[in-house]
Amino acid sequence: METLQTFHGVLDRGFTGNMSFQFHIPHGIHELSVILTYEKERIQDPASYIERFRHPLIRQAVPYLGRIPTDRQLQEMGQAMKTEIQLCAMIGGVFAGNVHMPGTRKEILLKEGVRSRGCLPYDGRNGMVKIIVNVYQVVEENTPWNLEIKGGPGHVETDRTA
């Protein structure tokens, strides 16, 4: 497969939102691979993070705990926090798939007879592709991300009557 488009950037701590990318699938492309990678999934130094953000963490925890969290609970919260990013694809306005498995690499593979977990079967159709990167939480400053869209001719039977 050849690279059709690449996008990259940096996310700030606390960012929540969506990034949307649209492009036309060139004629002759019958398989797509959409790969999102990012760094800093977990807090790099939980103890330092807790000290810097102690008061906001306590404010967030009190409604759930019904009291001020202990230092141990704050430490557990810091170790459990992670950056959460999902990857979604639509082709011609039709949902093609959504990947939200753990890890810093999310891939949607759309190929006739093969599909990624969380994706629908792909019939090799062309049209506008809309890639949506859903960002639910970023735990560290300057979190780099990269989105690469690859495509190839794949194998598409043109005469199924033979």
What spans do the regions from the language model cover?
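Acidic, Ser/Thr/Pro
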Residues: 1-162
